[in-house]
Amino acid sequence: GAALKRYPREKLLIATKMSNFQNYTRENSIKMYHQSMKELQTDYLDYYLLHSVGGGEGIKTFHDRYIDNGVLDFLLKEREEGRIRNLGWSFHGSVEVFDYLLSLDVKWDFVQIQMNYVDWRHASGRNVNAEYLYGELAKRGIPAVIMEPLLGGRLSKLNDHLVARLKQRRPENSVA
């Protein structure tokens, strides 16, 4: 927050997430949200994510973390009141959970998915078809935020043979 104070707030886009993995009571989750605002020294967030949706027991865990305790309703109210400008979620799970979240009567402003530039069909360790995820978001007009476009950095580590071929073709360019 202190570093952000050096710049006009309207020039920044601030994103953070709710990582309520263990103690996901309403009270603790709301406290976590307010603590983020306090530490960031801001009165609104541009992007707020429900972090790592789809893990644990899938739909049941999502309900435990956000629905049954009223946390999602709280966050929707915060968005309505302007303290959250865009509400979304980062996805790490099965297609069943992904489709379920899209079926809810909630206007999601964005969704963060794993996708890399080489293989859209196997975007993560869970072998989730990122092409499907992206397509479903596009059909609904929901912006996709991409995480791990370099597959956790593995795609940026080229073997010597490939580096040599790239340098041979365009020696003046970086291999990145």
Task: Outline where the language-model segments fall.
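Short loop/turn motifs at secondary-structure junctions
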Residues: 8, 41-44, 49, 83, ...
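A short, structured active-site edge motif that brings together acidic residues
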Residues: 10-22, 44, 48-51, 113-117
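Aromatic-lined substrate-binding rim segments of carbohydrate-active enzymes
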Residues: 1-8
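Active-site groove signature of glycoside hydrolases
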Residues: 38-62
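A contiguous, low-structure linker/loop signature
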Residues: 8-11, 36
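Glycine-rich anion/phosphate-binding loops
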Residues: 23-34
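Conserved hydrophobic residues forming the short capping helix/wall of the S-adenosyl-L-methionine
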Residues: 4, 37, 79
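Beta/alpha (TIM)-barrel catalytic core signal, keyed to glycine-rich beta->alpha loops juxtaposed to Asp/Glu
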Residues: 1, 53-176
